Amino acid sequence: MSFAGVLADADVKAALAGCAAADSFNYKTFFKACGLAAKSHEEVKKAFFVIDQDQSGFIEEDELKLFLQTFGAGARELTAAETKAFLAAGDEDGDGMIGVDEFVTLVKA
């Protein structure tokens, strides 16, 4: 599964280029730049299941580290600091993971 048909390739490339440098990732900026923030709740949920690579129903820290790579081959991994900040922003219930509803809330924030 990919983001084809949900997000425009040009928008995804621009979003990835905007955070190519280490410690430059900002989830709000990224979600707006790639167009995900403007999508419906259902489309955001589809994106969640692409990012949830092990299909556990949650995005864990190791999947967040590889977050950018789910949007484009050759993208960098998030740094440890970026990963922890991203997890803290999305993990509303403190279980150390981001569930689908938490992800929708994060994208739409």
From Swiss-Prot:
One of its GO terms (cellular component) is cytoplasm. GO terms for molecular function: calcium ion binding. The modification N-acetylserine is found at residue 2. Residues 39-74, 78-109 form the EF-hand domain. Keywords: Acetylation, Allergen, Calcium, Metal-binding, Muscle protein, Repeat. Ca(2+) 2 binds at residues 91, 93, 95, 97, 102. Pfam families: EF-hand_7. SMART domains: EFh. Ca(2+) 1 binds at residues 52, 54, 56, 58, 60, 63. InterPro entries: EF-hand-dom_pair (IPR011992), EF_Hand_1_Ca_BS (IPR018247), EF_hand_dom (IPR002048), Parvalbumin (IPR008080). Belongs to the parvalbumin family. In muscle, parvalbumin is thought to be involved in relaxation after contraction. It binds two calcium ions. This is Parvalbumin beta-1. It comes from Gadus chalcogrammus (Alaska pollock).
